[in-house]
From Swiss-Prot:
The keyword tRNA processing does not apply. This is Probable actinorhodin operon activatory protein. Coiled coil: none annotated. Keywords: Activator, Antibiotic biosynthesis, DNA-binding, Transcription, Transcription regulation, Two-component regulatory system. Residues 1-98 bind DNA. SMART domains: BTAD (SM01043), Trans_reg_C (SM00862). One of its GO terms (molecular function) is DNA binding. The keyword Transcription applies. Belongs to the AfsR/DnrI/RedD regulatory family. Pfam families: BTAD, Trans_reg_C. It comes from Streptomyces coelicolor (strain ATCC BAA-471 / A3(2) / M145). GO terms for biological process: antibiotic biosynthetic process; phosphorelay signal transduction system; regulation of DNA-templated transcription. InterPro entries: AfsR-DnrI-RedD_regulator, BTAD, OmpR/PhoB-type_DNA-bd, Sig_transdc_resp-reg_C-effctor, TPR-like_helical_dom_sf, WH-like_DNA-bd_sf.
Length: 255
């Protein structure tokens, strides 16, 4: 069994059947319990996620109904071969009883964490394999088919940061392995999606310069300077300005 949240939300049963989880408050509740696996999530937190500051008078009863529907859905589809209960009641709320390998988020976190450790140990190929495996679990934006309240929105932000962290580690591993050229398309994509991340801009500038594409590296700097000026009214960091001068002077650039 595997719950997959990193993209369109679905569950793969022990029998190998793929069960899409419909966009509903019951799915919203289940996803929050999965992300806080082995932790009792209070009814108040669940009500906040589902209705924010405007819960109905029947919120507690309706919450119990959603839990019932969730359990029935998982039971009807025989998600587990042993029919074990996955959503348990424990005051003051509920919790999801699943193993780490039964949730793609947990697997991704472990693989990226392992990749970072291997990178620190200079085991570059092993680090890259672990990071690739972790990042490949993303099939699109996390929780893309689930309505999200403010509690889940914070979880989405965490998952986006985790993905970015893993991608930066992978860039570092490839850089240290001398595989600079193939990183440029990914870096270009990253600076578009994270335009205020100066570290990514610096990596792109350095990669372009290393590949002999000095004009493009300088254009990348001008683009960063314009974005920072327009959005924040500041200049690039002194380190990036120094890199810019090194590129202008044809000196060796260190990133």
């Amino acid at each position: 069994m595997r719950f997959n949240l990193l993209g369109r939300v679905h569950v793969i049963t022990d029998a190998g059947c793929v069960i899409p989880l419909k966009s509903s408050k019951a799915t919203q509740l289940l996803v929050l319990l999965l992300l806080r696996r082995h932790e009792v999530v209070g009814s108040g937190v669940l009500i906040e996620e589902l209705w924010a500051d405007h819960p109905p008078r029947s919120a507690m009863t309706t919450l119990q109904t959603y839990v019932y529907h969730t359990r029935r859905l998982l039971g009807e589809h025989r998600v587990t071969s042993d029919d074990r209960e996955l959503v348990l009641t424990q005051p003051p709320g509920y919790f999801a009883l699943i193993d780490e390998d039964e949730l793609d988020v947990a697997v991704a976190e472990r693989l990226i964490r392992t990749g970072g450790r291997l990178l620190e140990e200079n085991r570059l190929e092993e680090a890259l394999a672990s990071l690739d495996a972790g990042l490949d679990l993303w099939r699109g934006p996390a929780l893309s088919t689930v309505p999200c309240g403010r509690v889940l929105e914070s979880n989405i932000a965490h998952l986006e940061e985790l993905r970015l962290f893993g991608m930066q580690l992978r860039i570092d591993a490839n850089w240290r392995l001398g595989r600079i050229g193939p990183m440029i398309p990914e870096l270009r994509s990253l600076v578009i999606s994270h335009p205020l991340n100066e570290t990514l801009h610096a990596k792109l500038m350095g990669a372009l310069c290393q590949m002999g594409r000095r004009a493009e590296a300088l254009e990348s700097y001008r683009n960063l300077r314009r974005i920072l000026s327009d959005e924040l009214g500041v200049d690039p960091t002194p380190e990036i300005q120094r890199m810019h001068m090194e590129i202008l002077n044809g000196e060796k650039v260190l990133v």
